[in-house]
Structure formats: structure tokens, C-alpha cells
Amino acid sequence: MKARVDDRPEEEEEVVAEADVAEHGRTADGETTSLDRRFFMQLQAFGGAGDTEQLVLSLEAAGVEGVLYEDVNDPRGVALLTLSETPDTFVSQLRGFLQSGPFAELEPKPDLTMLGRTYAIGHEQDLEDTLVERPRGRVLDPELRWAIWYPLRRAGSFEQLSRKEQNAILMEHGGIGMSFGRAGLGYDIRLACHGLDKADNDFVVGLLGPELHPLSIIVQRMRKTRQTSLHLERLGPFFVGRVAWQSAPA
């Protein structure tokens, strides 16, 4: 007869770890730090936008924090990137804003909707900069006129690798981004979207730069890495746009 849960030997009982939802980093001296703050970012795309100027005026009047892009692949397409430290913003102020005024007349493109949160991987020395200040500064930087946004889902094979193997793969991937960033050609925004994406993706990536060509090269280079070539299940769809409006940096 199968034993009831309360009849199992004590040594077989599962040890439940304490829930911890904070982001963690590490000081230069090796001390662990934590911060329970993060930015949520959402991209919503629309068609049927004949007059971008009216959209800009409505965004400024409402005090929306974010970016309006013109879709390079759709002459009547736009996308609105909004950011907030609380997801309530997207279903309260933003929801009401999009249901009225010029945005209410547009045609939503739900297949291009992306929602994610900033995160730390454990070695960052300045968590506030990593999670809040740097991502906000990047998307609102007037010099970074072009953007490519896309979701991705890792294959299960990546999760079966050891931590050492995972780190080596991520360093290869991250090295490309750092080299382009040092040259001022492109910067990335990486957001976790576990459980936040209707297609069950894992991450949302934004590539931002003063010109579009280097951003395309970043994607091309990353195709050759072990993570993309061996351990990705899905990549895209891609939104490609140029900044039409940005809110003032905080």
C-alpha cells in the first residue's frame, strides 16, 4: 500500500526553500547584495497610424513615460514602448489612455506585444543602475534612434547544462554586445518574461543604436554563438522601428 504523505520517513520530506523575489548582486569585496526593484517594459504595436504627430501630442499631454517608434516595415505602423516599476500602470493609466484619443483609432498587432522585467544575474555591483537607471537611460537616450525588439525562448537543452557551461555560453553571447557597446554602435536591453508572454517565451531583447545597420550585424553575429545555434527553441517575431518621440529622461 502506498504510504500517505504524512507517513513518509522524515529524511524523505522535501525541503522547501524560503521564497526570495529580490534581485541579487555582489560587491567588489564579494559581499552579496539585494534589491527588490525592477522596471517592467511593454511594447505594443499598431497599424493604421496616418498621423504620428497627433499620437505624439496625446502622449505628451498624458505624461506617458516611454518611446513611440515608427515601424520601418509598415508605412502606417507604430509601436509604443512604456515602462514602469509597477505592472498596475499597464492595466490602469495606460489601458485608459489607449482606449481614448488617437490611439483608440489604431489597429492593434497583438502578435508583436512584448512584456518583460529587468533582472540581475548575480554579479552586478550596482543593482539600482542595472535594474532601473541604465535601462531607463538607454530607451530614453535621444542618440539611440533605432531599435529592434524581439522575444526568444531557450531550448530545454540549455537548462540541462552545468552552471559552468551555461556561464561560458552566456559570456560568448555577452561579449558581442559589449564590443558593440564600447564602440557606441549598439546596446541591448534584456528583460525576463517568464509567465508574462502568451507564447511562453523566456526573454525580450531590445537592441538600440544610432543607426540600424550595426543592430542587424549584432543579430547576425549572435546567430553563430552556441546559445543561438544550439540552445534556442524560438526567436522573434521582430519589430524594427525608428524613434518618433521619447519622453524626457527622469
Model-found features: residue ranges?
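A short glycine-rich, hydrophobically flanked beta-strand micro-motif that places a catalytic Asp/Glu
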Residues: 186-196, 204, 236
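Alpha-helical oligomerization segments
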Residues: 207-250
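Short gly/pro-enriched beta-turn/loop segments at secondary-structure junctions
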Residues: 141-147, 187, 198-200
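Conserved RNP beta-strands of RNA recognition motif
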Residues: 80, 205-207
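Short S/T/G/P-rich N-terminal loop/turn motif that feeds into the first structured element of a domain
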Residues: 1-63, 75-76, 83-179, 210, ...
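A generic structural motif
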Residues: 66-73, 109-113, 229-243
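A short beta-turn/loop motif at secondary-structure boundaries
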Residues: 69-75, 193-199
